[in-house]
Amino acid sequence: MGSFKGHALPGSFFFAMGFWWTMKNILKSVYKRQTRTCYLNSKTLLRRTEIWEGVVVLLMSLTGIAGEQFISGGPALILHKDGQWNQILGWHHTTMYLFFGLQGITQIICFTTNVLPLSSSKLMLSIAIFVETFMFYNHTHGREMIDIFVHQLLVFVGTFSGLVAFLEFLVKNNALLELLRCSLLMFQGTWFWQMAFVLYPPCGSATWNLSDIQNKMFLSMCFCWHYASILILIGVKYALANWLVKSRLRKGCTSEVGLLKHADREQESEEEV
C-alpha cells in the first residue's frame, strides 16, 4: 500500500460499498415511509442482494490481497526471508483485506444457508473494521509528523465505524445507525484518497512538507470538510430517492384510478344493453 495506487484502491472499495449501502438503506427507508408494502423488503430480493454484496466484497478483498502480495514487488506470500520479516507493512494490508474477505464469506453463508444467524454478517463487519483500525494504529512507527497524523485520523474514523457497526449488530433495523455506518465507510474511502495525494502526490503535483505544522492544521480542517461533503451527498441522495418514490407511487395511483374508471364505464355500458 506504500504508493498512490495502494491507497486509492482501498479508498475506492470503501467508498463504493458505502455509497451502495447508503442508496439501499435510503430506498428501504423511503419506501417504508411512503407505502405499507415495499418491494425492496421482499425476502427473495433481499437475499439475492445480500448474496451479491458478499460476493463483491469477497472479490474486492481478493483483488486487494493479490495487489499487495504479487504486484509491484510484493512479498509473494513469503513472510520471513533472509533472517528477517519480509515487507511486514504489506502483510498488515493483506491482513486487513483478509478480514473483509471473511466478512464477505460470512454474508454469503448467512443468506444461502441456515447455518449462521443473519446478524453474523454485521458482527463480522464490525470485527473487520476493528482489525483494520488495529493494523493502522501499529503502522506508523518512526514516520514523519503528517504521515502519522493522517493515519491517526483514519484510525479515529475506523474506530467509530467499528463501534457503530457493532451497535447495528445489537440494535436491529435502525435506519439511522445504518446510514451512520455507511457514511463513515464512505468517509474512510475519501480519506484514503486524501492520504494518497498527501503522502504520494502524482507526477506534476506539489510535494507536501510532512513536518509542517500548518499542513497539519489544514488537514484537520480538510478532514471535517470530507465528512461535511459526505453528509451533503447523503442529503441529496435522500431527497432524490424521496422524489423518485413519490412520483412512482403517484403514477401508480393514477393508473389505478384510470382502471377503476374504465371498469365503471364498462359496467354502465353493460347495464344500458
Curated annotation (Swiss-Prot):
Membrane topology of this protein: Multi-pass membrane protein
Where located? Membrane
Record keywords:
Membrane, Transmembrane, Transmembrane helix
Organism domain of life: Eukaryota
What sections of the protein cross the membrane? Answer: 8-27, 55-79, 108-131, 153-171, 217-236
User: Which Pfam families does its entry note?
Assistant: DUF716 (PF04819)
Against InterPro entries, the record matches this protein to: DUF716, TMEM45
Q: What name goes with this protein?
A: Transmembrane protein 45A
Q: Which organism is it from?
A: Mus musculus (Mouse)
State the gene name recorded for this protein: Tmem45a
